Structures are given as C-alpha cells and as structure tokens.
Swiss-Prot record:
Keywords: Chaperone, Cytoplasm, Stress response. It is found in: Cytoplasm. The gene is grpE. The keyword Chaperone applies. Belongs to the GrpE family. It holds the Pfam family GrpE. One of its GO terms (biological process) is protein folding. This is Protein GrpE. Participates actively in the response to hyperosmotic and heat shock by preventing the aggregation of stress-denatured proteins, in association with DnaK and GrpE. It is the nucleotide exchange factor for DnaK and may function as a thermosensor. Unfolded proteins bind initially to DnaJ; upon interaction with the DnaJ-bound protein, DnaK hydrolyzes its bound ATP, resulting in the formation of a stable complex. GrpE releases ADP from DnaK; ATP binding to DnaK triggers the release of the substrate protein, thus completing the reaction cycle. PROSITE patterns: GRPE (PS01071). Residues 1-42 are annotated as: Disordered. GO terms for cellular component: cytoplasm. SUPFAM superfamilies: Coiled-coil domain of nucleotide exchange factor GrpE, Head domain of nucleotide exchange factor GrpE.
Amino acid sequence: MTDETNKNGPEAAAPEEFETAAEPQAAEKPEADASTTAPDPLELARAESAELRDKYLRLAAEMDNLRRRTERDVKDAKSYSVAGFARDMLAVSDNLRRALDAIPADAREAGDAGLKALIEGVEMTERSMLAALERHGVKQLDPTGQKFDPNFHQAMFEVPNTEVPNNTVVQVVQAGYTIGERVLRPAMVGVAKGGPKAATSESETPAA
C-alpha cells in the first residue's frame, strides 16, 4: 500500500500543481482588461479644453451682440426721444403756415406796415421753430418734382399733367418730416397723371 501510494503520489499531485499555477494568470487577466478600458487623461484634458473654448466663444459672441444692441438702443433713445414732442410741434408749425397762406396776395402787396410786420413776425417764428427741430434731427421733406415714394409720401389726389412723368409729385398739401432715419410724418402730396413713364436709369435696367 505504501509503495502504491508513493508511486501514484507525484502523478496525482501534478494536476493540482497545474491548477494552482493557472490561477495567477486568471487573476491577472481582469487587470489587463482594466488597463485597456481606462480613459486617457490627456484625451480627457483635450476634450475639456475644447468644451471650455466653445463656451468661451459662445459667451464672447453673446456679449458682443449685447454690446451692439445696447449701443443701438442708446442711439435710438437719443435720436427718437423727442419724436412725440416734435410731432406736437409740427401742428404748431402747420398752423403758422396756414396763417401765412390765408393772407390774400393783394393784401401783401398793399404795403400796410402793420400787416407787413405781422407777416414777418410769423415767418420768423416759423423759421425759428423749424431750425430748433432740425437741431434735434427733425428735417422737412420737399418732394416737389420727385417720384412718388409711398415710404415718404401720402398721395391725396391726382393731377392730370402730360408734361411730367407719371407719378411725379407736383403739389405738396402738407409738408412731411423725418427724424433720424425714420419718417416722422409723410408728406401729403398730389401726383401727376397721364404723363410718360419715368425714365429708368442704367443701374435699374435689368440685365439682358
């Protein structure tokens, strides 16, 4: 029995030794898998840097747009803050002009000193008021002889006239005004009808 045991002992122990030796390799395999799946710190830093740069560029663009909007709003506030007051003053200017137009031509030519002084005073007041409005960006439109533009003019009637191009402003019923780049009040006008079409400039001629 002893000999058989000694004889079979080494052979029986061999598989156990192989199994024991294989265990460290099996334990090392998960470590190898973990090392291959771990994120690269350099790549993480690059991705974070790109994300921060994108956020910075977006913020810079938003701040630039905000600055431009603020500058435009401040400019508009300065330019158009007097629009309501100027519109009210135009009614006063219109009344001064109506008063002057109501004076008959023969009365003007009569040479009455009192009437002449009154006319000069009203005209001076009108000029002074228009000059004050112009200092605040309000300008009077004089569209007589110009082509009718619905952005600046309001057609009140048509005048048969074959001597000027069609849709030419031939009479101003009420003066128009602009403030800055905006129309404060369109000019009320009469336009010609029946004349030739307005000549087209070379720049407006469509290309063949």
